[in-house]
């Protein structure tokens, strides 16, 4: 008698490539800049019995909740080993959990990680003073209805001018984003934990979908 096969179905997001860049970025922000110091990085050899899981990244959030980004590999073992990768985004709170989309995951993360405009920036902008803080996670605000204050600060931050196209500030922040990911690729966990080098500037985070290359 043939043994009955049980299936466990969970929503996942396909990844067009490998997850090394994602792992390197997490380690860079955890050990080099310290911005993700509280985040737990669990590599595949510490996951345990879940052999299809290549990593777990656990982001502690407010009020005892947390967000887990779980990476999967070799999702079609019946066809032999294939370089197929995907991630699962799950939000946990006590005895409850639910899967979330990348945009919701960005909003949850930005509530605890990566700096945003401070409460005093609106007054500084009205007085014509220099803005001292910026939003380093702009993709987390997409899909929301922004306040007029936030829109005004975004205009000041990006220095928008309809006749000049993309501002120098926005270009610089995009370069900073690429630089962060490029540095993350060179991240060496063993060397960085005791390197003694000064912390890098606050990181501009482009969002989970862009970093992971999620194919919706």
UniProtKB/Swiss-Prot annotation:
Ranges annotated as biased composition (Basic residues): 170-188
InterPro entries per the UniProt record, alphabetical: Vif
Post-translational modification Phosphothreonine, affected residues: 98
Motif segment (BC-box-like motif): 147-156
Top-rank lineage group of the source organism: Viruses
Localization per record: Host cytoplasm; Host cell membrane; Virion
Chain positions covered by the region annotation Multimerization: 154-167
Residue ranges annotated as motif HCCH motif: 110-141
Domain notes: The BC-like-box motif mediates the interaction with elongin BC complex.
Protein name stated in the entry: Virion infectivity factor
Species this protein is from: Human immunodeficiency virus type 2 subtype B (isolate D205) (HIV-2)
Gene that encodes it: vif
């Amino acid at each position: 008698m043939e043994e009955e096969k049980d299936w466990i179905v969970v929503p996942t997001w396909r990844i067009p490539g490998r997850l090394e860049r994602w792992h390197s970025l997490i380690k860079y922000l955890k050990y080099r800049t310290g911005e993700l110091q509280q985040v737990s990085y669990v590599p595949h050899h510490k996951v345990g019995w879940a052999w299809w899981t290549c990593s777990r990244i656990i982001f502690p959030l407010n009020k005892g909740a947390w967000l887990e980004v779980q990476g999967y590999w070799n999702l079609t073992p019946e066809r032999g080993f294939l370089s197929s990768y995907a991630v699962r985004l799950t939000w946990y709170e006590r005895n409850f959990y639910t899967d979330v989309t990348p945009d919701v995951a960005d909003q949850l993360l930005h509530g605890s990680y990566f700096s945003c405009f401070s409460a005093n920036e609106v007054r500084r902008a009205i007085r014509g003073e220099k803005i001292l803080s910026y939003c380093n996670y702009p993709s987390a605000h997409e899909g929301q209805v922004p306040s007029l204050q936030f829109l005004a600060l975004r205009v000041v931050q990006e220095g928008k001018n309809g006749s000049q196209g993309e501002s120098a500030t926005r270009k610089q922040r995009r370069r900073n984003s690429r630089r962060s990911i490029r540095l993350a690729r060179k991240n060496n966990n063993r060397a960085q934990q005791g390197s003694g080098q000064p912390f890098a500037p606050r990181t501009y985070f482009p969002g989970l979908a862009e970093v992971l290359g999620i194919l919706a």
